């Protein structure tokens, strides 16, 4: 059964979120990046995951809930904190960027 993992780009003015499929510890991109607040990343991610009917509802909800937590953290001041702090807060999400 496939597993899924979020990844994020921590940018100065945006947070970009994407999903990878994880098979045998190897990650393969499943979606492109969705940007917040430039676009409604959460709604776009939801629509993308729903279009992939082979992803279970449980997995979709889990990914969207975790994306919500990440967006809220970034929005509530996390964007001004070092990436290392975000990575410590969200160890299950691969985070990269320029801060």
Swiss-Prot record:
Keywords: Ribonucleoprotein, Ribosomal protein. Gene3D superfamilies: 3.30.390.140. GO terms for cellular component: ribonucleoprotein complex; ribosome. One of its GO terms (molecular function) is structural constituent of ribosome. The keyword Ribosomal protein applies. The keyword Coiled coil does not apply. GO terms for biological process: translation. It comes from the Bacteria. Part of the 30S ribosomal subunit. HAMAP family: Ribosomal_plastid_cS23 (MF_00619). Probably a ribosomal protein or a ribosome-associated protein. Belongs to the chloroplast-specific ribosomal protein cS23 family. This is Probable small ribosomal subunit protein cS23. It comes from Synechococcus sp. (strain JA-2-3B'a(2-13)).
């Amino acid at each position: 059964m496939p597993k899924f993992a979020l990844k994020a780009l921590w940018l100065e003015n945006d947070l970009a979120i994407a999903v990878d499929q994880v098979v045998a510890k190897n990650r393969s991109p499943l979606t492109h990046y969705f940007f917040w607040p430039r676009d409604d990343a959460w709604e776009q991610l939801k629509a993308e995951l729903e279009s992939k009917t082979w992803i279970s509802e449980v997995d979709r909800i889990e990914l969207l809930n975790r994306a919500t937590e990440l967006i809220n953290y970034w929005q509530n001041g996390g964007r001004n904190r070092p990436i290392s702090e975000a990575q410590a807060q969200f160890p299950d999400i691969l985070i990269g960027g320029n801060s």
